[in-house]
């Protein structure tokens, strides 16, 4: 039986409404893991809270504690292009840690980690399996510890990094997964559009998350 680790930032309520009560809840130090047993897999779900660092810590915890074979992250995001509308569900092909910046000392471009491409690819095998189930749009994700509310800033990120969506956890999860040689898959759904912002996010994030959960189980059955 496969072991899947799932990192959820703040969208745990829609997930629980869709999946029901877990078979077991394990509290260990500052972590709380909800464990679901399915016919084809065991699912270890942890709510990390916002930000790259908490998401990275939770990723490492699931890998160390439960020996998960893959990491799945789902959640709501903001659109960086007017071509992407509310509640559009997508799969992340690449992640740019767009606020990472050591350029003053090493002349490496903003967003680029040493020994990695600027746009860090997610696991191709998991992406392809997900796409076999649902024909999702493949996107490039801008990840950084800041909620982007201003449409002009969104457009600037899109122009500089070629990113389609933005959020606050994917870079931390992906970098940690890569370090551990554990594949990661990211399924995202748009809450706030290009000209939306914090108000639209607050108003539509839970509805968008519910749409995303409808797709998750179909995908996980194939992983």
What annotation goes with each model-predicted range?
Residues 1-60, 65-66:
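N-terminal short beta-loop-beta anion/metal-coordinating cradle
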Residues 18-24, 65, 85-96, 207:
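A glycine- and small-aliphatic-rich helix-loop capping segment at beta-alpha/alpha-beta transitions
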Residues 43-48, 140-142, 187:
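Active-site-proximal beta-strand elements of phosphoester/diester hydrolases
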Residues 69-72:
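Structural motif
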Residues 80-161:
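Mid-sequence, gly/pro-rich, charge-dense loop/helix-turn segments that line enzyme active sites
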Residues 147-195, 199:
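A C-terminal functional module that forms or caps the active site or interfaces directly
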Residues 194-223:
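His/Asp/Glu-rich mid-to-C-terminal helical/loop segments that flank catalytic regions of hydrolases
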């Amino acid at each position: 039986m496969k072991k899947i680790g799932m990192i959820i930032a703040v969208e745990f309520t829609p997930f629980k409404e869709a999946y029901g009560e877990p078979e077991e809840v394990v509290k260990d130090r500052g972590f709380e893991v909800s464990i679901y047993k399915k016919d084809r897999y065991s699912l270890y779900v942890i709510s990390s809270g916002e930000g790259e660092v908490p998401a990275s810590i939770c990723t490492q915890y699931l890998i160390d504690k439960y020996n998960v074979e893959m990491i799945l992250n789902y959640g709501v995001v903001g659109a960086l292009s007017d071509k992407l509308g509310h509640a559009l569900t997508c799969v992340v092909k690449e992640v740019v840690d767009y606020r990472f910046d050591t350029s003053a000392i090493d002349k490496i471009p903003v967003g680029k980690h040493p020994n990695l491409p600027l746009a860090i690819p997610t696991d191709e095998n998991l992406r392809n399996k997900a796409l076999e189930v649902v024909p999702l749009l493949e996107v490039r994700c801008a990840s950084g510890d800041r909620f982007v509310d201003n449409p002009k800033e969104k457009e600037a990120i899109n122009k500089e990094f070629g990113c389609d969506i933005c959020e606050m956890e994917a870079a931390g999860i992906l970098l940690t997964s890569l370090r551990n040689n554990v594949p990661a898959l990211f399924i995202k759904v748009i809450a706030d559009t290009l000209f939306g912002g914090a108000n639209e996010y607050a108003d539509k994030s839970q509805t968008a998350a519910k749409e995303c959960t409808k797709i998750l189980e179909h995908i996980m059955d194939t992983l």
